[in-house]
Regions:
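Thiol/selenol-based redox catalytic cores and closely related redox-interacting motifs
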Residues: 34-117
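Local sequence-structure signature of Cys/Sec-based thiol-disulfide redox active-site neighborhoods
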Residues: 1-23, 27-32
């Protein structure tokens, strides 16, 4: 079953959830604020997605901005970035849709459709 990792108050996550429901796609919902991704999960998802770790950061989030990560990330190692992401789910870009063979970061309807149909 697909894992849908989101922050329920996020409007993009709400749109993604509605899209999943409208298309009758079964998923397991996980609130990223209540159940923060672990270092092991983040490492697996980064590897499975093929995306650079920086793509997993919620660059529009208040926490990202308050920590000045725009300026700090370039000097960090991949391990340091993953460990930082594992400290707070609000640093992680959302929603995440995770299947057996894929990890989608952010909601792009066309991309999601290609992977779940």
């Amino acid at each position: 079953m697909l894992k849908f990792i989101c922050y329920p108050k996020c409007t993009t996550c709400q749109r993604a959830k509605k899209w999943l429901d409208d298309n009758r796609i079964e998923y397991e919902l996980r609130d990223i604020k209540l159940d923060n991704p672990t270092l092991e999960e983040l490492t697996e998802w980064c590897n499975k997605s093929g995306l650079p770790i920086k793509k997993f950061f919620n660059t529009s989030g208040l926490l990202y901005k308050s920590l000045d990560l725009k300026n700090k990330l370039p000097g960090m190692s991949e391990d340091e970035m993953l460990k930082l992401l594992a400290t707070d789910g609000m640093l992680v870009k959302r929603p995440l849709l995770i299947g057996d063979n894929f990890v989608l970061v952010g909601f792009k309807e066309v991309e999601w459709y290609e992977f779940v149909r």
